[in-house]
Amino acid sequence: MPNKSPTRTLYALFGGTFDPIHYGHLKPVETLAQQVGLQHIILLPNHVPPHRPQPEANAQQRLKMVELAVAGNPLFSVDSRELLRDTPSFTIDTLESLRKERGAERPLAFIIGQDSLLSLHKWHRWQSLLDVCHLLVCARPGYAQTLETPELQQWLDAHRVFDPQALSLRPHGAIYLADTPLLDISATDIRHRRHNGESCDDLLPRAVQRYIELQGLYRG
């Protein structure tokens, strides 16, 4: 029998506006790391998200909150390249840049939520994503489990893997739907709470909460 491809270290990228970063971002991906054997997660704060309203916090404030949220946690690092752009942040551009840096053979994954999977066909060059990386999908409360059309569902089914070890055997091309905790926390809810003078202490790391207070962010 031919030998299996050697297992390589799996790295993952997790992008977002992070306005602000909160436990709904962090806890599911920490669980995901345990499930699939992730050695490292690179957080990628977006500068100008193409599909969303402009963030309330500026780029440097959002970067600082992300850095504070994961300080001292060896699972995470922060990549600020998207914040240096003056143009919209397209995921495929960043992934192709990172792929060139890390070589063609290293397994690379991009983490998204179930909500993003459902709208993935609206992303810029979405069909090129699996040519560059794997997709790791975290469950999100209240979102459908099937895609919009039979064609999209067939695309998902054709690339889906059920054994997370398969992600480390090839550099890209697979989709894994993870069983992560469903935390009904959103940045929108946190901003609304702040606008209304309500506490957010249980929704985000203490260091991030202190920074928000010091900067006077998300006040009504």
Swiss-Prot record:
Organism this protein belongs to: Yersinia enterocolitica serotype O:8 / biotype 1B (strain NCTC 13174 / 8081)
The protein's enzyme class: transferase
Keywords annotated in UniProt: ATP-binding, NAD, Nucleotide-binding, Nucleotidyltransferase, Pyridine nucleotide biosynthesis, Transferase
Annotated catalysed reactions: nicotinate beta-D-ribonucleotide + ATP + H(+) = deamido-NAD(+) + diphosphate
PANTHER family: NICOTINATE-NUCLEOTIDE ADENYLYLTRANSFERASE-RELATED (PTHR39321), PHOSPHOPANTETHEINE ADENYLYLTRANSFERASE (PTHR39321:SF3)
Annotated EC: 2.7.7.18
Keyword DNA damage: no
Domain of life from the UniProt record: Bacteria
Protein's name according to its UniProt entry: Probable nicotinate-nucleotide adenylyltransferase
Recorded family membership: Belongs to the NadD family.
Pathway: Cofactor biosynthesis; NAD(+) biosynthesis; deamido-NAD(+) from nicotinate D-ribonucleotide: step 1/1
Gene Ontology molecular function: ATP binding; nicotinate-nucleotide adenylyltransferase activity
Region forming the signal peptide: none
GO biological process, alphabetically ordered: NAD biosynthetic process
Keyword Cell membrane among UniProt keywords: no
Pfam families recorded: CTP_transf_like
Gene3D superfamilies, A to Z: HUPs
Function of the molecule: Catalyzes the reversible adenylation of nicotinate mononucleotide (NaMN) to nicotinic acid adenine dinucleotide (NaAD).
